[in-house]
Amino acid sequence: PAALAGWQFSRRPLRGAGPVLLLVLSVAMGMLAIGQSASWNRSQSDQADFGSGASVRLVGGQGGGPATAGIYGGLDGVRQAAPAHRTTVEASGGRTAEILALDTAHADEGMLMRSDLAGGSPRRVFDAIAPEPAPRPGFVLPKDGTRVKLDLRITTVSPKPSGSAVDPDEDPPVVTVLLEDRYGLPYRFLAGPVPVDGRPVPVSFAVSAAGGLAVTGIEVDDEPPFGQAQKRRVAVSDVRVVTGSDSPEGSEGSEGQEHPVPVSGSVRWDASMALAERGDSRPGEPPVRNGTSGLPDFTYDTGVENDDDWERTTSTLRITAARPKAAPLKAVATDDYLKKTNAKLGDEIDLTLAGNTVRVTLAESVRRLPTTGAAELSGAADPAQYGGALLLDLRAVTEVLARRTTATIEATE
């Protein structure tokens, strides 16, 4: 049959040209369609990776309480979670620049950044802005803890109280417990009023088992007494953690076992006193640490209220765990940012983060940063007013802001 077909084609060569050309055209169009489909799918995948920066991206805060700290990292099926804080700042020429502070140590997918955008390995870009590893401040709670319990007491040291230890007309000091999760994000728990009578006041609050929280200090807000300053002693003692609770929020009715939290005597604490009067703030007498137990224990001077002032003076005693000196902040800039701000690598710039001005060094540059550049995210109504983007390490940012009493930063995604 093959020989016969060949003989027929040789007798009439043009009769088979049409079917052959049609077959070739069909194969070519099929290959073109396959190539276009693969190219389109790859393009859509690249755009999706650039827009999300991770396999799953969740935009929106998780709440500011210690009971929700690190909650996404504890969900079933989640291998790793990296918090981020996104904001915008004014750039030169009325432009709007995008700022992304990301926990690069836990962003193990590298923002899904392509090597052609990073100019090499994306990990090299992250390493350029990551801080050096450092021990965590304060005392770290056990991983499976769902509730923290501790005792607070405030005692008048001098002058010694006569009669009733507590003046019923005076409002007691209000204490706030300061915490920090494994990402360096700060949390606050309002413990409430603590009478100045020397008796322990029990404090109990829920924490997230997935947060890796550490107690990093306390704040005592008060009003100085009239006529005469007092020496008072504030101390934290008997810190315990509840484990094995059946309730995800660690409620009182479903508690498990209590365990003491080990506190090393090597933990150091710093304390400062600030007095606010008529809108002005001034430092008070430096508090004095008592003992070496590893828990906050300080004697402080309350200051004195002037009878002639119609506006009450307020005081804040802030006790925080000692930290090593924060490393200088570094940033990765997009080519767009460098071009539109006339900046270059090695320049130092000032940025406003969480209401505080921080100094940042431009350490690396990339063509573009994933998750940045969209008008609805950058805040620039006109694309021409977009001023590029900067990437910072969230841990490095929180280390700098931790030393500023007015700074609070939250994860926005």
For the regions a language model picked out, list residue spans one by one.
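Juxtamembrane segments of multi-pass membrane proteins
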Residues: A2-A134
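Basic-flanked hydrophobic alpha-helices used for secretion and membrane insertion
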Residues: T68, R86-A91, E98-E413
